[in-house]
Amino acid sequence: MTDYFEVHARDGAARIGELRLSDSVTTPAVVDDVLADAGSLWAAERELPDGSDDVLTVLPHRSLPAGSADEVRESFSVAYPDVDFPSAAVVTADTADDFGADAYVLSDAQGFVGHARAFRDNVIEAKENLPADTALVLSGVATPRNVSLLVYAGVDLVDEKLARARGLEGFYLTSDGEYFLEDLDELPCACEACRKPASEFTRADAADHNANALRAELARVRRRVRDGRLRDYVEGQARHDQWLTALFRRFDQQYSFMEQRVPVIRDSELTAASEESIDRVEIQRFADRVTKRYRNRFDNPLVLLPCSAKKPYSESQSHRQFQEAVQYRAHMVSMTSPIGVVPQELELTYPAQHYDSVVTGDWSEDEKSFVAEVLRRYLERNDYPRIIAHLPPGAYTDIVERVADDLDLDVEFTVSEHPTTTESIGNLMRTLDGEPKFTREEREHNVVKALADYQLGPDAGDALFSDVALEMTSRYPKLQVWNDAGVQLATMVPQYGVLSFTLEGAKVWRDSDAPTKTVEIDGFVPHGSVLAPGVVDADEDIRPGDEVVVEGPKAFAIGRAEMGGRELVESTRGIGVEIRHVEER
């Protein structure tokens, strides 16, 4: 149980936290000024310190180097006492466990920083073994260049030791590199240490500058985490050092570790500006849900369309032309890099309306392969009487032809030169001649069911609403879902493209065959939010931002999770669920 560290915001594994000392420290941060080391037990026996609320006290410890044998670790393990002051325990990834501390220092960090695979494996093992609501500390490894990646991986606290040491060795550090002092004609910084001519700049000044640069970079990182856009930043930062590039890619390979920490909804823009953007959890998750959860419910032909720069697609000039040509006679699905395929019902769902990519007209082979794989999986799951490709010649048509050949499908192409030319629009209209129209009501019902599929699981839309006579009020995209008894079940949230349930809707969800995400609470009636100490249990597959049913002996509620399932159970501080509706039992 931690009393002195609390997480306030999350962006994947990165977190904004509070080290609750007399003067609180917002993390991620440098900890030099508030860290008190009680000493190593290798040198001598140590008395348990009195501790203080002013500092984070590292309890007496035995640090072991990276690669120490298991029997050595066991022989020299330390029994950490329970204390009533802010404390940190020293561990390795192998020995990491809940010792009742507020923070944990990885003693062998200097042995694996610089080695991407070892860093990834050690940090992930430590994060999986330590309590979710404690701080992770890495000492002697942080620089302005690498600290954003350290935070991205889940590190909360660092120190200035390496940055200052490099300065005393004659190196001037920046967020994108390092320079020999003698190579600097001018100082590319305006911090207090740099307010002198380069000719008068000493190694001691460099140490001060490096510490200032590290603190400034951490401030930038904290802002990015608050905005939910740290990933956008580290995609660029990783380019400044080969091991950081390797580390970045290694963490992308750990989908499970990252996915359980990445929110399912955000209102911030997702910038897809590099090849690695395809590997983002948000993009992989969307593609996975579209091809495993979503199911087309229209009986009409499929029309494949290009994406548009404007989001949502339906509000773009080109897609309005396509809609006028289609006239409710076909199911429209957009193809895009790096998202994959976007059925019209999910065009508002994060990240389909939130991403922005570099538009050059040229697709890399990786982009083509990814979109082709998503389209192939989509067409394997969804049957259509006809497939019409209203796509510009080039990458789009290459992808469709590749998939059509693999699946032995017939595809009708309708574009001459460009999708919005008069000739191309006319071709699309004529190709759909004689096809029956679906109604606006049918479209709206299918939107609601598709959102339920995407949010909750395969066929959830039918499980929730097949036995309910749905009535829609308001117009798309602000749909409200009512049953035939005049009781509201849910509302579509245009900002995120998800369903927000009422209490009655939550009961329908709970009693249906759709997978239910449930948070079990203690015997109280929550008002506004459920704090983590009140959580008794929670489904492991809950992600931050998920719609969740909250049940306890005295209350039934519906709300949105602020933490993942594991964190809900393990945390002793912080808001676990934001409650929307509640009733007493």
Swiss-Prot record:
GO terms for cellular component: cytoplasm. GO terms for biological process: tRNA wobble guanine modification. Disulfide bonds: none annotated. Pathway: tRNA modification; archaeosine-tRNA biosynthesis. It holds the Pfam family DUF5591. It catalyses: 7-cyano-7-carbaguanosine(15) in tRNA + L-glutamine + H2O = archaeosine(15) in tRNA + L-glutamate. SMART domains: PUA. One of its GO terms (molecular function) is RNA binding. It is an enzyme of class 2 (transferase). Its EC number is 2.6.1.97. Residues 516-584 form the PUA domain. Disruption phenotype: Cells lacking this gene lack archaeosine in tRNA and accumulate preQ0-modified tRNA. InterPro entries: Archaeosine_synthase_1, ArchSynthase1/Queuine_TRR, DUF5591, PUA, PUA-like_sf, PUA_sf, TGT-like_sf, TGT_C2. Keywords: Transferase, tRNA processing. Is responsible for the final step in the biosynthesis of archaeosine, a modified nucleoside present in the dihydrouridine loop (D-loop) of archaeal tRNA. Catalyzes the conversion of 7-cyano-7-deazaguanine (preQ0)-modified tRNA to archaeosine-tRNA, transforming a nitrile group to a formamidine group. Homodimer. Belongs to the archaeosine synthase type 1 family. This is Archaeosine synthase.
